[in-house]
Amino acid sequence: MKGILGRKLGMTQVFTIDGTLIPVTVIDVKPNVVLQKKTKETDGYEAVQLGYEDVKEQRSNKPAIGHAKKANTAPKKYIKEIRADEMMNFEVGAEVKADLFKAGDVVDVQGTSKGKGYSGTIVRNNAARGPMSHGSCHHRHIGSLATNGRNNGVVNKGTAMPGQEGGYTTTNQNLQVIKVDAEEGYILVKGNIPGPRKGLVVIKTTVKPVKEVTPVEIISYAGTSVEEELEKVAETIDEEIASEAVATEEGK
């Protein structure tokens, strides 16, 4: 298992060579710095402490400055521990870049969901409304919470109630990495991830067993003209049509 910190930039879409559209989220992954290594001998477990985004010393405190100097770096705005065997190969002060992952990897992305404020059960829990007519006063209220006979009026844990919606840590699992660019410092993952734009996210190897995913080849306009890319797409489509025609002839 391995992991890295980044920031959500937003969503866009890319096209594969065969013309398939894939919605992707762009994650800005600047180099992370290893600030500390936790070992079983000293701490009882193995983990790597990563720092992300520099902070001016005048905006930091002495403990944070001293901790960062052990890794020969500036104090960091965000510090996270990653419990991962593969990360133990990095030494203190080493940089962890976006090429830690590659296209075709399946990852989990953890972040803080968008805060929605105080919401009722209809919005927060998708609860049904009450009767809207015939003298009913129960339109958007919660409804029954407990019974006096069976559980003596005790409200069970997990009952849908109004309250804070969003603003909590959540994880989107099994997202495919579409592209990694270590030079520009970004990762494209398929689908959406939690949090607002510029929100901090943690990209980690998925914890669930998944099948091996074949990397997809997407159209890149860097250094080439649109006409050249369209010619490549046309050639691919022609090859697919030709192979289908051969299969049809053999079937006859």
What is the role of each PLM region?
Residues M1-K252:
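Extended basic (Lys/Arg/His-rich) segments that typically form rRNA-contacting surfaces
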